[in-house]
Curated annotation (Swiss-Prot):
GO terms for cellular component: cytoplasm. Its EC number is 3.1.26.4. Its cofactor is Mg(2+). Monomer. Belongs to the RNase H family. Endonuclease that specifically degrades the RNA of RNA-DNA hybrids. Residues 3-144 form the RNase H type-1 domain. This is Ribonuclease H. It comes from Shewanella sediminis (strain HAW-EB3). The lineage of its organism: Bacteria, Pseudomonadati, Pseudomonadota, Gammaproteobacteria, Alteromonadales.
Length: 156
């Protein structure tokens, strides 16, 4: 599509205890502009926060964009680029005939991705990648801030 805005999104999730208090961090870059988003939850898991971070970033966009989305979560990246196709065909059941974990967030991420051209990239965590380190700090600080907000979809 001609004239799509091109931006970079970096995401990370954190959880103290897993399950426990958790948070996500997002850094969005468009031209010379940078926006940071973070929030925390009372009880959640690291995987839920790794999924929620790109959801929040993508839901913040008002128009279809060309995006390079970088995360240190193989779970999120493989899920959205590979596993989700089979899950949808099988009615959100895994290859081992179990319900897909975090299905509420996978459906939301799938929906939030629509209309965008996304290059899903993985980066090794805690390896000095500036934006990933910033996301990690945002996510950890949100988790450590004694969040009261409930992660509605989390099931212990």
């Amino acid at each position: 599509m001609m004239g799509m805005k091109q931006l970079s999104i970096f995401t990370d999730g954190s959880c103290l205890g897993n399950p426990g208090p958790g948070g996500y961090g997002v850094v969005m870059k468009y031209k010379q502009h940078t926006k940071e988003i973070a929030d925390g939850f009372l009880l959640t898991t690291n995987n839920r926060m790794e999924l929620l971070a790109p959801i929040i970033a993508l839901e913040a966009l008002k128009v279809p964009c060309k995006i390079v989305l970088t995360s240190d979560s193989q779970y999120m990246r493989q899920g959205i680029t590979q596993w989700i196709h089979g899950w949808k065909k099988k009615g959100w059941i895994t290859s081992s005939k179990q319900p897909v974990k975090n299905v509420d967030l996978w459906k939301r991420l799938d929906l939030a991705s629509k209309g965008h051209e996304i290059d899903w990239r993985w980066v090794k965590g805690h390896a000095g990648h500036v934006e990933n380190e910033r996301c990690d700090t945002l996510a950890r600080e949100a988790a450590e801030a004694k969040p009261k907000q409930e992660d509605i979809g989390y099931q212990a």
